[in-house]
C-alpha cells in the first residue's frame, strides 16, 4: 500500500510539474526595459514602449544607438522627444542645434529652452513649477504635464517600478470584468511567468482573443494574458476626453492644380514671364522664386513684381510666390 501511495504521489508530481500552473513571477524591470534607477517605463495606448522600439523609429535623426523612452528627474516624469513625436503628438519639434523645443499653434509658436521652467506661448512668457525640458546629450526629454497641456491625452503614474500609463487614442475599446482573483501572465499559458495579480471585479481592456486566453491591459500598466474563463461582461465602450483641438486654417481649391515653378533669380528676370508662359499650356498656377533670407538676422529679401502678377492674372493664372532656400538663398 505504501509503495502504491508513493507511486501515485510520484505520478501526481510529474503530472503537476507538466500541467500545473507556475508561480514564477516575471522580472518586471526586464519586462519594462528598465536599466537604471531614473528610467521611466512607458505604456502608451496599451503598448509597452521599450528602448529598441523608440530607437528603431528614430534612427534616421538621432546620433544615439538607443533612446531610453522615459526618465525621472527631480521627481518629475519625462518622455523622450522621439517617443513623443512618434507615439503621442507629432506636432512637437526638437531643434537639437538651437536646443529649443517648438510647438506651432494656429496663431503663433510655443518655444521652450532646455533646462528651463519658462516658455513663450505666442507672445506671452509663462512658467511652470517644474523644468519643462531636460536633455541628455542630443536627446530631449519633455515633462508629461507640459505635453498634456497641448495634447488630447490622459496619464497616470505608478511605482515599483516607475511607469507612466498614457492614453492618447480615443474611440471604441473592448473591456471585461475579472470574475475572481487570478493572475495576468507574460504569455498565454500556465507556465508563463506572472506579471501581476488582478482582483475580482477589476476592469481590464481586452486587446486580443486567443480562445482559452485573452491578451489584456490592466489599469496599472501591465499588458499580458489572462484565462478567458476568468473574465465576464465583455463589452464595447466609447472612450473620449474633453479637449479642444487647435484648428489650423488652410486653403482649398475647387479644381485640380497644374503648377509650374519659375526660377526668378533677379528682378529683371520677372520681365520674362510672358515668354515663359507662351511655351506652356493647361497651367492654373505659376510659382516664382521671389523671396529669400537676406542675412543671418532673419531679414527677407524680395524681388516680387506687380506687373508680373497682373500679367499672370490676365492670363487666368494664380501666382503662388516661393521662398527660395537654395543657391545661397
Where do the PLM segments sit?
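A short macromolecule-binding patch
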Residues: 179, 220-231
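Chitinase-like catalytic core of GlcNAc-active glycosidases
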Residues: 254-263, 267, 277-280, 292-329
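Primary recognition of N-terminal secretory signal peptides and signal-anchoring hydrophobic helices
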Residues: 1-210, 232, 239-252
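SH3/SH3-like beta-barrel fold
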Residues: 103, 201, 213-218, 226
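Conserved, mostly hydrophobic/aromatic
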Residues: 286
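Short, solvent-exposed loop/turn elements at domain surfaces
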Residues: 51, 184-187, 215, 266-273, ...
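Extracytoplasmic/secreted envelope proteins and their assembly/folding machinery
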Residues: 81-85, 144, 148, 270-273, ...
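Conserved residues at the C-terminal ends of beta-strands
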Residues: 289
Amino acid at each position: 500500500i505504501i509503495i502504491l501511495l508513493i507511486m501515485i504521489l510520484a505520478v501526481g508530481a510529474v503530472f503537476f510539474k507538466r500541467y500545473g500552473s507556475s508561480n514564477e513571477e516575471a522580472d518586471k524591470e526586464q519586462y519594462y526595459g528598465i536599466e537604471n534607477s531614473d528610467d521611466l517605463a512607458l505604456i502608451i495606448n496599451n503598448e509597452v514602449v521599450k528602448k529598441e522600439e523608440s530607437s528603431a523609429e528614430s534612427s534616421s535623426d538621432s546620433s544615439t544607438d538607443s533612446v531610453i523612452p522615459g526618465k525621472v528627474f527631480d521627481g518629475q516624469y519625462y518622455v523622450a522627444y522621439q517617443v513623443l513625436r512618434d507615439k503621442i503628438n507629432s506636432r512637437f519639434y526638437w531643434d537639437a542645434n538651437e536646443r529649443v523645443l517648438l510647438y506651432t499653434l494656429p496663431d503663433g509658436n510655443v518655444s521652450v529652452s532646455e533646462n528651463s521652467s519658462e516658455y513663450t506661448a505666442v507672445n506671452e512668457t509663462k512658467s511652470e513649477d517644474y523644468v519643462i525640458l531636460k536633455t541628455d546629450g542630443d536627446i530631449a526629454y519633455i515633462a508629461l504635464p507640459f505635453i498634456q497641456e497641448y495634447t488630447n491625452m490622459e496619464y497616470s503614474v505608478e511605482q515599483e517600478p516607475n511607469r507612466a500609463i498614457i492614453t492618447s487614442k480615443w474611440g471604441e475599446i473592448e473591456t471585461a470584468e475579472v470574475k475572481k482573483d487570478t493572475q495576468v501572465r507574460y504569455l498565454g499559458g500556465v507556465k508563463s511567468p506572472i506579471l501581476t495579480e488582478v482582483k475580482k471585479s477589476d476592469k481590464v481592456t481586452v486587446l486580443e482573443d486567443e480562445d482559452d486566453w485573452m491578451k489584456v491591459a490592466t489599469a496599472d500598466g501591465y499588458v499580458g494574458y489572462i484565462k478567458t474563463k476568468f473574465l465576464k461582461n465583455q463589452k464595447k465602450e466609447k472612450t473620449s476626453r474633453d479637449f479642444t483641438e487647435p484648428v489650423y486654417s488652410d486653403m482649398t481649391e475647387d479644381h485640380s492644380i497644374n503648377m509650374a515653378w519659375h526660377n526668378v533669380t533677379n528682378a529683371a528676370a520677372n520681365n520674362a514671364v510672358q515668354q515663359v508662359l507662351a511655351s506652356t499650356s493647361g497651367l492654373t498656377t505659376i510659382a516664382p522664386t521671389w523671396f529669400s533670407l537676406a542675412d543671418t538676422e532673419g531679414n527677407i529679401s524680395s524681388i516680387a513684381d506687380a506687373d508680373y502678377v497682373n500679367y499672370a492674372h490676365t492670363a487666368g493664372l494664380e501666382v503662388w510666390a516661393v521662398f527660395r532656400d537654395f543657391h545661397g538663398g
